[in-house]
Amino acid sequence: MEFPSSPPPSYETVMAQVPSILAPLVPPRYKGATEGRNSIRYSQLPPLFDTTKLYLIDNKSSDIQALNYQNDHSNFLTTVVQNANYTPMEASTQSIQLDERSRWGGDFRSILHMNMPNVTEYMFSNSFKAYLPATADASGKVLTYEWYTLTIPEGNYSEVMLLDLLNNAVVENYLAHGRQHNVKEEDIGLKFDTRNFYLGFDPETELVMPGFYTNEAFHPDIILSPGCAVDFTHSRLNNFLGIRKRLPYQEGFIIKWEDLQGGNIPALLDLEIYNPDTPGDNITPLLQDSKARSYHVGEDPSAGSTFTSYRSWFLAYNYGPVDGIKSKTVLVAPDITCGVEQIYWSLPDMAVDPVTFTSSHNPSSYPVVGTELLPLLPRSFYNGSSVYSQLLQESTAQTHVFNRFPENAILKRPPAPTIISISENVPALSNHGTLPLKNNIPGVQRVTITDARRRVCPYVYKSLGVVVPRVLSSKTF
């Protein structure tokens, strides 16, 4: 087929070449009564120039019973023929015809509101695995270890509450398993904390000379006993802790006690033996708490006689060797949303499929026409009296369950941070640009919102879309 090298002749030229006695045959290009290439044709209506927008509504009352009884706000059907006299069944037989001589596009804008909590099984933020002591002999020496899956209840928690729930999950696992097989309380294996245990450390005595660890929060931390480990391979809770892999695309994320070189917690000065009148004498480490729980001082030959066998990720990262845990992980700002990702919009009956996609009835394989961040945002505020509020809650809200070992300087409840984070669902208004539209748009449209794993999201509360059709170009050129 050959195409003309010049534009078609003008109307006057055509009229001059045809005798006036004959009815001239004017090419369709010159017909203006049908609005030409901008025409939009509805069923049973003549072609007309139309500025009607296409509204994608997730909760039309007429659509619910007929179309969406088994759907939700992230995967629904909606009628786009704006006629109150049509039932959804009648609208499904209608269509909107965009002039075939033009290529059409639609400016797509969306409004999305979600009510997602920050700890859910759906987002892999309510559980993690830990390698903890399982059995011990009569003297308390640990014999075997096992992998346990620790789970916390789903909910929307602040940073302080989430830390308490993580530690409570460890304690409940110990009560259900380790305690039943002679494992001692000081060998619980795993603790989440927020303190910097190196503050007050004297390099000469190699002890924390104040006799207590500074009760101030700095950054979420992981404390492990010898032989223990924590696994975040299938969990997002490491994002809440502000601990990420330095190479995030590599498979697996396990932090072992052996990885935390240089992270041994220094022992406290035993204040009962120390005499301030003779500061150079009687400088000995505190070996156990008032309930005879051992601090395991001097049990790690690689650390020295004044260090406990507990190892802290925060200490290993900041004070350990460069080729240690710092080469594998990176300290980042804690994310109370546990690292939510993106969502995808799909309009399979309206937008032209990319050549690499094929039509499907499976929402996980619909062509993607728009993407945006999931609208769950962290909010931070400063509370200088957070530790005071925490102590006040112990007597008013009866939160003693979060402080099972108050006599132990390491296993006690971690102090609340002064910078508190909460998660908030913020409605998002997004402009997705121009989408290529099909020339034949069915009266009932499928609208799907999927997460990063291409799953429909049950936490979508409101999803709206507006598409404004317009001509992009002519199909003849």
UniProtKB/Swiss-Prot annotation:
Q: Where in the cell is it found?
A: Virion; Host nucleus
**Keywords tagged on the record:** Capsid protein, Host nucleus, Host-virus interaction, Late protein, T=25 icosahedral capsid protein, Viral attachment to host cell, Viral penetration into host cytoplasm, Virion, Virus endocytosis by host, Virus entry into host cell
One family from Pfam that matches here is Adeno_Penton_B
What induces it, per record? Expressed in the late phase of the viral replicative cycle.
Which terms does the UniProt entry file under GO BP?
endocytosis involved in viral entry into host cell; virion attachment to host cell
GO terms for molecular function, please?
structural molecule activity
- GO terms under cellular component: host cell nucleus; T=25 icosahedral viral capsid
**Where is this protein primarily located?**
virion
Under InterPro entries, the record lists: Adeno_Penton_B (IPR002605)
- Is the keyword Signal assigned to this protein? no
**Record function comment:** Major capsid protein that self-associates to form penton base pentamers, each in the shape of a pentagon, situated at the 12 vertices of the pseudo T=25 capsid. Involved in virus secondary attachment to host cell after initial attachment by the fiber protein, and in endocytosis of virions. As the virus enters the host cell, penton proteins are shed concomitant with virion acidification in the endosome.
Quaternary structure annotation from Swiss-Prot or TrEMBL? Interacts with the fiber protein (via N-terminal tail region). Interacts with the capsid vertex protein; this interaction binds the penton base to neighboring peripentonal hexons.
Q: What other remark does the UniProt record contain for this protein?
A: All late proteins expressed from the major late promoter are produced by alternative splicing and alternative polyadenylation of the same gene giving rise to non-overlapping ORFs. A leader sequence is present in the N-terminus of all these mRNAs and is recognized by the viral shutoff protein to provide expression although conventional translation via ribosome scanning from the cap has been shut off in the host cell.
Family to which this protein belongs: Belongs to the adenoviridae penton family.
What is the name of this protein? Penton protein
